[in-house]
């Protein structure tokens, strides 16, 4: 079962996100990842296949990842094999939108085909990446309004899910 954590505040986000993910380890997972934003800089994505220990080592327990806002995820594969590429978070092609997700997007293939026709690229075999790119499409279409982008995307996504986005 997937686990989702998020943090925004006055402290470094990565160690807090990793601590939150460690509290979800009992649920089982095949990969984990975090996305952290440091002010106006691009969102930094760090992922690892396997145990959370691998992600902790890659990030020096989060200490090497600056930023005070982030999201994290432990994944139990439902679409796509367990791999670093399929691990969450996923990010839009331009890096503006990152997301973690739990659940199933039933119409992800249909949405993916529409986005491919609009020039989007896909690197994973997850339904989550489709959701990120769909939100990004509406984010660009509606002049950079996160609320409008999410609202328009949610009307089109069918399934049972939780989705946490970071802009």
Whereabouts are the PLM-identified features?
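Conserved short alpha-helical segments that host acidic/polar catalytic motifs at enzyme active sites
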Residues: 1-167
């Amino acid at each position: 079962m997937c686990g989702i954590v998020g943090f925004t505040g006055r402290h470094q986000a990565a160690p807090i996100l990793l601590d939150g993910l460690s509290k979800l380890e009992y649920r089982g997972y095949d990969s984990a990842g975090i996305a952290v934003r440091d002010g106006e800089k691009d969102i930094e994505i760090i992922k690892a296949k396997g145990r959370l220990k691998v992600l902790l080592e890659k990030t020096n327990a989060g200490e090497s990842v600056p930023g005070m806002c982030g999201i994290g995820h432990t994944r139990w594969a439902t679409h796509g094999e367990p791999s670093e590429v399929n691990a969450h978070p996923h990010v839009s092609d331009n890096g503006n939108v990152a997301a973690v997700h739990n659940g199933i997007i039933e119409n992800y293939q249909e949405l993916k085909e529409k986005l491919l026709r609009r020039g989007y690229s896909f690197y994973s075999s997850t339904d989550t990446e489709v959701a990120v790119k769909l939100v990004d499409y509406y984010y660009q279409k509606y002049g950079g309004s996160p609320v409008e982008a999410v609202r328009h995307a949610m009307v089109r996504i069918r399934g049972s899910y939780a989705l946490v986005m970071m802009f």
